[in-house]
Design a protein with these regions (language model features):
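Bacterial signal peptide processing site
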Residues: 17-21
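Acidic, glycine-anchored loop motifs typical of Ca2+
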Residues: 161-162, 176-184, 229-238
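Beta-propeller blade signature
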Residues: 121-129, 183-196, 239-251
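Conserved beta-propeller blade repeats
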Residues: 143-168, 207-224, 259
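Beta-strand C-termini and the immediately following turn/loop, strongest in propeller blades
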Residues: 113-117, 168-175, 223-230
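Sec-dependent bacterial lipoprotein signal peptides
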Residues: 1-15
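Beta-propeller fold detector
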Residues: 135-140, 200-205, 253-259
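Structural signature of eukaryotic scaffold interfaces centered on beta-propeller domains
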Residues: 32-105, 117, 148-163, 174, ...
Length: 259
């Protein structure tokens, strides 16, 4: 099933931690040619029609809620269409708290959450099976890095079943460096959504760009690393200050600057 979206902005998706895009085709369209004839990662942020496709329906802890990630379609060098697919971040190594007695995380990176990524994921639709309604979490296409959503199978943390009732999404949604494109050179945002698909808040201030995170299972906290755009040029580099934000996963509205 394909739909046509009005492109407000979109770019090439690569997740925060290093990975390779799972494709064996030669992509002649991953980059846009600018006015000078140079190849630029990402596409013009201005209005442009493009095709999208879905991959699969994702079950969540809330039985009436289903997520449908949406991907931009591309054409290979032979003119055949293809699109990204849902991929999961999982951890199998027997290390740390996840393998202590009373903890069963079903290979999830974070207790109670599935974490997904996919090449050029541009939106996600929330299906409410009770009301038969759907809702796009973003009004316009964005560049999604990853989505954390409540796992359909309950994990246990410190001998207790753990429940999650919200989503967290890391994405690029603005041409912050004003170069005409939305891509990984822009500031990366981190948003909190409720299970109705409403955006609750930005977990990290907009003048920061998320660069990574790690999970503290002892305290059920997500430590988010972000660099401050101190010179206000719309992108960040290694010379700009790196800070740590603590997201209490029991009450994610409470985000504290640790460093």
């Amino acid at each position: 099933m394909k739909k046509i979206f009005l492109l407000a902005f979109i770019a090439l998706t690569i997740v925060a931690c290093e990975r390779k895009t799972a494709t064996d085709v030669v992509d002649a369209n991953t980059y846009t040619i600018d006015a000078q004839g140079n190849m630029v990662e990402g596409l013009l942020k201005d209005s442009l029609l493009f095709a999208t496709e879905i991959d699969k329906v994702l079950a969540t802890e809330q039985a009436h809620c289903r997520l449908v990630p949406i991907f931009r379609t591309r054409k290979d060098s032979y003119g055949n269409s293809y699109s990204g697919t849902v991929n999961y971040y999982e951890r199998y190594a027997e290390e740390g708290i996840r393998f202590q007695s009373g903890n069963s995380w079903h290979d999830n990176l974070i207790a109670g959450f599935k974490t997904i990524y996919g090449s050029e994921m541009v939106n996600v639709s929330l299906l409410n099976l009770q009301t038969k309604q759907k809702k796009y979490l973003f009004e316009k296409p964005v560049l999604i890095e990853n989505i954390y959503y409540p796992a359909p199978i309950r994990d246990t943390l410190n001998h207790k079943p753990i429940s999650r009732d919200y989503y967290m999404i890391s994405c690029y949604d603005e041409d912050t460096d004003k170069n005409g494109y939305v891509n990984r050179g822009d500031l990366r945002r981190f948003y909190l959504f409720n299970t109705e698909g409403d955006r609750v808040k930005a977990l990290i201030p907009k003048e920061y760009s998320v660069v990574g995170s790690d999970y503290d299972g002892v305290n059920d906290i997500l430590n988010v690393y972000a660099r401050l755009d101190s010179n206000k040029d719309g992108n960040v580099d290694a010379n700009e200050p790196k800070h740590i934000f603590c997201v209490d996963l029991k009450k994610p509205e409470n985000t504290v600057l640790l460093y």
